[in-house]
């Protein structure tokens, strides 16, 4: 249970300063975005103790980085640096300072967008990998059509035309 097995509607940002190993790495992997301090390290070293990562890393990691790299990390228990995580697409950005500051900036940028659009975009991104090609456009329309018919969308279009930020 817990955060590693649910998909909240609101975006989750992991701010990693230092080590995210085992459960910490699995918690970060359950987030939508990961920002890290330059000194951060990620890994699932459970195999070194005769265990296996069971809070989602073995499921999520090969969906977020190349399968062979995920296999290497899971089978050896090795760590990767924040920079390597960035190169692999696991980490969104690396900060020289506190990761929390960068995460708060990113959160503020997201919060400045239309909440319905953000929630619907996240839902499509998360759920679409399960959709068959024959149904993907109709399911996406079911989720996104209400966004385009919302007050947020009307205000966004008006603000764009008037060259101002949405209210």
Language-model features: locations:
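Short, well-ordered beta-strand core segments
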Residues: 12-13, 20, 34-35, 94
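Terminal peptide-recognition signature
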Residues: 28, 61, 85, 121, ...
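C-terminal long alpha-helix characteristic of the crotonase
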Residues: 35-40, 82, 91-139, 145-151, ...
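Active-site-proximal glycine-rich helix-loop-beta segment
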Residues: 23-34, 38-39, 57, 82-84, ...
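Short glycine/proline-centered loop/turn elements that form peptide/ligand docking sites
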Residues: 22-23, 40-45, 97
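Short helix- or helix-capping micro-motifs
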Residues: 16, 61, 69-78
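An acidic, glycine-rich surface segment that forms the CoA-thioester-binding/catalytic face
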Residues: 1-17, 49, 59, 64, ...
């Amino acid at each position: 249970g817990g955060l590693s097995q649910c998909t909240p509607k609101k975006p989750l940002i992991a701010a990693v300063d230092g080590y995210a190993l085992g459960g910490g790495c699995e918690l970060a992997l359950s987030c939508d975005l990961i920002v890290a301090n330059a000194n951060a390290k990620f890994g699932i070293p459970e195999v070194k103790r005769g265990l296996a990562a069971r809070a989602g890393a073995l499921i999520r990691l090969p969906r977020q980085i190349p399968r062979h790299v995920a296999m290497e990390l899971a089978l050896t228990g090795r760590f990767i640096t924040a920079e390597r995580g960035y190169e692999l697409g696991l980490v969104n950005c690396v900060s020289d300072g506190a990761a929390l500051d960068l995460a708060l900036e990113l959160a503020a940028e997201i919060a400045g967008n239309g909440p319905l659009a953000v929630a619907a975009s996240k839902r499509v991104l998360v759920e679409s990998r399960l959709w068959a090609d024959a149904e993907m456009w109709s399911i996406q329309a079911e989720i996104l059509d209400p966004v385009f018919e919302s007050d947020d969308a009307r205000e966004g279009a008006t603000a764009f035309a008037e060259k101002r930020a949405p209210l």
